[in-house]
Amino acid sequence: MTNRILDMEQMQDEEYVERTLRPQKLNEYIGQDKVKDQLKIFIEAAKLRDEALDHTLLFGPPGLGKTTMAFVIANELGVNIKQTSGPVIEKAGDLVALLNDLEPGDVLFIDEIHRMPMAVEEILYSAMEDFYIDIMIGAGEASRSVHLELPPFTLIGATTRAGMLSNPLRARFGITGHMEYYELADLTEIVERTADIFDMEITHEAAIELARRSRGTPRIANRLLKRVRDFAQIMGDGLIDDSITDKALTMLDVDREGLDYVDQKILRTMIEMYGGGPVGLNTLSVNIAEERETVEDMYEPYLIQQGFLMRTRTGRVATAKAYEHLGYPYTEK
């Protein structure tokens, strides 16, 4: 996969930064108002009844704060949170160890829950629904079934691909939260908050410009802010203003619509080689030398959301906005 500054997946050096910036309470969490408003009600109701919060599924593109939201939920509930991810839970014993370590009301957070092996997932069904698990101990004739009661707990699952969840697993989540790309005003506030925490000087206009080019994604906004700060220190006096922001992002190949060279390559390939489409996903992937899943999951969502690309039954189509943005003449088909 191409190493892009606009990659929505977490890079190796970003875990510490994201932990440092992580809000503790819902009223500190910027954006995602619809999800927050629902969670406030569900959390307060669970606390009033002295019950564990219903199992919660958070889904949406990478970098939008699903992990942060899980930790905020645990803080609001006043309980411990145990964190793991689907690929890490390789066998039933791994999951049993996690479940057996939970206290009443605790949160078990499983990131990338769609990547859990099916054999492990099936153990979760009774754990989520009735708070018990039955496991086999031993092998052959010496094997026996052991019934293990669990304390009431809350499972929070996070996924970028909700469609890959099995129906039985999805049905056991009482609460679902769709994390959406951030509005410009919210992302601007996030940029200014990050700058304040790390003692960076930034003008409001620069924060707006940086947010506008961050693809509606806080992770990208914070990453770009770090890079623009470097430019401000070397090419200026340390102040991040709109001029240095524009120069820095232009040098980083991030245009005014938040598109980088890969996004532009996708659109130019469609326009120059296929007359704007329709183009099949496999054909497009081969032409830009990327995996099909990478194009579908990482590049297309933002291009579609911003109106540069359409998915049709016959393939991908570049829109009039894509032609205009890249300077190509557009003829209505």
UniProtKB/Swiss-Prot annotation:
It catalyses: ATP + H2O = ADP + phosphate + H(+). This is Holliday junction branch migration complex subunit RuvB. The RuvA-RuvB-RuvC complex processes Holliday junction (HJ) DNA during genetic recombination and DNA repair, while the RuvA-RuvB complex plays an important role in the rescue of blocked DNA replication forks via replication fork reversal (RFR). RuvA specifically binds to HJ cruciform DNA, conferring on it an open structure. The RuvB hexamer acts as an ATP-dependent pump, pulling dsDNA into and through the RuvAB complex. RuvB forms 2 homohexamers on either side of HJ DNA bound by 1 or 2 RuvA tetramers; 4 subunits per hexamer contact DNA at a time. It comes from Streptococcus suis (strain 05ZYH33). One of its GO terms (cellular component) is Holliday junction resolvase complex. Residues 183-253 are annotated as: Small ATPAse domain (RuvB-S). The keyword Chaperone does not apply. Keywords: ATP-binding, Cytoplasm, DNA damage, DNA recombination, DNA repair, DNA-binding, Hydrolase, Nucleotide-binding. Residues 256-333 are annotated as: Head domain (RuvB-H). The gene is ruvB. Mg(2+) binds at T67.
